[in-house]
Amino acid sequence: MAIKTYKPYTPSRRYITGVSSEDITAKASVRSLLVKLPAHAGRNNNGRITSRHKEAGAKKLYRIIDFKRRKFGIEGKVEAIEYDPYRNCRIALISYRDGEKRYILQPKGLGVGDVVCAAESGLDIKPGNAMKLRNIPVGTIVHNIELKPGKGGQMIRSAGAYAQLMGKEEKYVILRLASGEMRQVLAECMASIGEVGNEEWSNVTIGKAGRNRHRGIRPQTRGSAMNPVDHPHGGGEGKKNSGRHPVTPWGKPTKGAKTRRKKASDKLIISRRKGK
């Protein structure tokens, strides 16, 4: 997939780039795999904003994705490659021999007509197949990795993401993430072979505010542009700096301050991510 540019018939359109849709083959989605999700726009059940800078965005339907990949021993053929408005990678429509159809994340190199399968072991190491981590050879690139057996893939699901299987220790395997983090995952967990497709997405330039509004992202107002009643950085004459380290509207340190809480799974992280 290539990055495409646009003719600058408006000033904002000059800098917009997008990913070519030449890989998309589907004319329509499978209706039984579509569901309407309510738009919360960052509000809780009381209607109060709990996550700022969010809105409904463009109208869209959610595609039900098979993250579990537990349909063992039944081969499926890739019927179509589709666009998914809820994620930045493409999805592949798989038609299984028993007649069932499911969506999976499209790994790099998977195309229409290819055959994929899921099993505990014994499959070829090719994009789209899924196996338990204990049966995948060391050095293999994987994605859509479970953290709890049977729960479905939770890690490595966005466009261009991947992890590499570095070793095996008793009931755990060691994975190296793209960030450089080394992490243990239970060997009974499932993972899909290959790197997630649409890797050019990271090079896309949004280009104008309206495009983010379609994605459901509202503008962010700087704290220094507010009044003192609204933000700790507010007030002052002209463009005066805040005179303090960056904080949130509620006075908590931000912009680089570590906020991650300690939890039991911390012991599974062998080495932290490396700075880029």
Curated annotation (Swiss-Prot):
<dbReference type="InterPro" id="IPR022666">
    <property type="entry name" value="Ribosomal_uL2_RNA-bd_dom"/>
</dbReference>
<dbReference type="GO" id="GO:0002181">
    <property type="term" value="P:cytoplasmic translation"/>
</dbReference>
<dbReference type="GO" id="GO:0019843">
    <property type="term" value="F:rRNA binding"/>
</dbReference>
<dbReference type="Pfam" id="PF00181">
    <property type="entry name" value="Ribosomal_L2"/>
</dbReference>
<feature type="region of interest" description="Disordered">
    <location>
        <begin position="208"/>
        <end position="276"/>
    </location>
</feature>
<dbReference type="InterPro" id="IPR022669">
    <property type="entry name" value="Ribosomal_uL2_C"/>
</dbReference>
<keyword id="KW-0687">Ribonucleoprotein</keyword>
<protein>
    <recommendedName>
        <fullName>Large ribosomal subunit protein uL2</fullName>
    </recommendedName>
</protein>
<dbReference type="GO" id="GO:0016740">
    <property type="term" value="F:transferase activity"/>
</dbReference>
<dbReference type="InterPro" id="IPR005880">
    <property type="entry name" value="Ribosomal_uL2_bac/org-type"/>
</dbReference>
<feature type="compositionally biased region" description="Basic residues">
    <location>
        <begin position="255"/>
        <end position="276"/>
    </location>
</feature>
<keyword id="KW-0694">RNA-binding</keyword>
<dbReference type="Pfam" id="PF03947">
    <property type="entry name" value="Ribosomal_L2_C"/>
</dbReference>
<comment type="subunit">
    <text>Part of the 50S ribosomal subunit. Forms a bridge to the 30S subunit in the 70S ribosome.</text>
</comment>
<dbReference type="GO" id="GO:0015934">
    <property type="term" value="C:large ribosomal subunit"/>
</dbReference>
<dbReference type="InterPro" id="IPR002171">
    <property type="entry name" value="Ribosomal_uL2"/>
</dbReference>
<dbReference type="InterPro" id="IPR008991">
    <property type="entry name" value="Translation_prot_SH3-like_sf"/>
</dbReference>
<comment type="similarity">
    <text>Belongs to the universal ribosomal protein uL2 family.</text>
</comment>
<dbReference type="InterPro" id="IPR014726">
    <property type="entry name" value="Ribosomal_uL2_dom3"/>
</dbReference>
<dbReference type="GO" id="GO:0003735">
    <property type="term" value="F:structural constituent of ribosome"/>
</dbReference>
<dbReference type="InterPro" id="IPR022671">
    <property type="entry name" value="Ribosomal_uL2_CS"/>
</dbReference>
<feature type="compositionally biased region" description="Basic and acidic residues">
    <location>
        <begin position="230"/>
        <end position="240"/>
    </location>
</feature>
<comment type="function">
    <text>One of the primary rRNA binding proteins. Required for association of the 30S and 50S subunits to form the 70S ribosome, for tRNA binding and peptide bond formation. It has been suggested to have peptidyltransferase activity; this is somewhat controversial. Makes several contacts with the 16S rRNA in the 70S ribosome.</text>
</comment>
<dbReference type="InterPro" id="IPR012340">
    <property type="entry name" value="NA-bd_OB-fold"/>
</dbReference>
<keyword id="KW-0689">Ribosomal protein</keyword>
<keyword id="KW-0699">rRNA-binding</keyword>
<dbReference type="InterPro" id="IPR014722">
    <property type="entry name" value="Rib_uL2_dom2"/>
</dbReference>
